[in-house]
A protein has these predicted regions:
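Phosphate-binding beta-alpha-beta segment of Rossmann-like dinucleotide-binding domains, i.e.
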Residues: 86, 92-141, 156, 160, ...
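Rossmann-like adenosine-cofactor binding region
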Residues: 51-57, 171-266
Length: 318
């Protein structure tokens, strides 16, 4: 019987799938290091955000496969798993719909002042509608920074709101961008024309602090920046300073650096920020599908039917 370790809360659908196939599936907490004492007995791992480093791998004497509960894998030390020839599988295009919807929700929340209006109605201030103006999305200019799976869906949704959609992706030739959108050749030019900027950039060390003081100072003082991608794309100190100085500038953040944010993080105290707890993909439907993808990656691997399109480190088989 193959033994599967699950670290972090995972939807029951995939776990039931594995148990029905006679796998032993153990769910352990990663809130402390006690799970490390048992690592040596498991053949497979389903992991969310737990750090899988050299210590982890060296303790996992029988580990044959890692199934990442997500698309990114910056919590996994690729070098050590390559050295041990342990395959790492991701889930593929499962979360693009909920994350793109969440992006639009943050944009709407900011434009329509939902959080502020809600708080004022609860304070019996119904007349706030006469003094505090929200905005239409129609005809507003939005820059989608990164045109991958999620960026494409966000672009389509923005079109439904009759927004002017601009696309920038340095890894994509301009002719790959549909003519229904406007391609941006140089990200440093004309940044001040945008009402919204939303980030959809995959993990890459070169992208760290991509949005810094220099970038922010080129934006309109009434722009809003949305990040449902990666916390480290934005220099939080620079963003904090910019938000404090420009009260009409807004941010919608689902991701932080580090996570969770410290309770003393000043972003949590600002009115011109909308915050969610890295929950964009955490819908019932998406979590069930993510769990099933992890389970199938494991069962397919042990049945010699692995889906190499979901395999991160293909070189271990070359």
């Amino acid at each position: 019987m193959k033994k599967v370790l699950v670290l972090g809360k995972v939807h029951s659908s995939g776990l039931k799938f594995l148990r029905d196939l006679s796998y032993q599936v153990d769910e352990l907490s990663d809130q402390d290091d006690s799970y490390k004492e048992k690592l040596n007995i498991y053949d497979a791992l389903i992991v969310k955000m737990t750090k899988v480093d050299s210590e982890f791998i060296n303790l996992s004497k029988n580990l044959q496969i890692i199934a990442r509960h997500g698309v990114g894998y910056n919590n996994v030390d690729i070098n050590i798993i390559n050295e041990k020839k342990i395959p790492l599988f991701i889930i593929g295009d499962v979360n693009s719909t909920p994350v793109s919807e969440h992006t639009i929700a943050l944009i709407l929340n900011i434009a329509k002042k939902i959080n502020y209006y809600d708080s004022q109605v609860r304070l019996d201030n119904f007349n706030v509608r006469n003094t505090f103006q929200s905005r239409d999305l129609s005809s507003k200019k939005i820059l989608i920074y990164g045109y991958g799976r999620i960026g494409k869906k966000v672009a389509q949704l923005c079109k439904f709101f009759n927004m002017e959609v601009y696309i920038y992706d340095k890894f994509l030739s301009l002719d790959k961008i549909p003519n229904t959108f406007k391609a941006v050749k140089n990200i440093e030019e004309n940044l001040d024309i945008f009402d919204f900027i939303t980030l959809h950039i995959p993990y890459n060390n070169s992208g760290r602090s991509l949005i810094d003081k220099s970038f922010l100072n080129k934006l309109s003082k009434e722009c809003s920046i949305i990040n449902t991608s990666r916390g480290d794309l934005i220099n939080e100190n620079d963003l904090l300073d910019h938000l404090k100085k420009n009260k009409n500038f807004n941010a919608g953040l689902d991701v932080f650096d580090p996570e969770p944010p410290s309770k003393n993080n000043e972003l949590l105290k600002l009115d011109n920020v909308v915050l969610t707890p890295h929950s964009a993909a955490y819908t019932e439907e998406c979590l069930a599908e993510m769990s099933m993808h992890c389970a199938k990656n494991i069962s397919d691997f042990f049945n010699n039917k692995m889906n190499k399109s979901l395999l991160v480190n293909k070189d271990i088989y070359s």
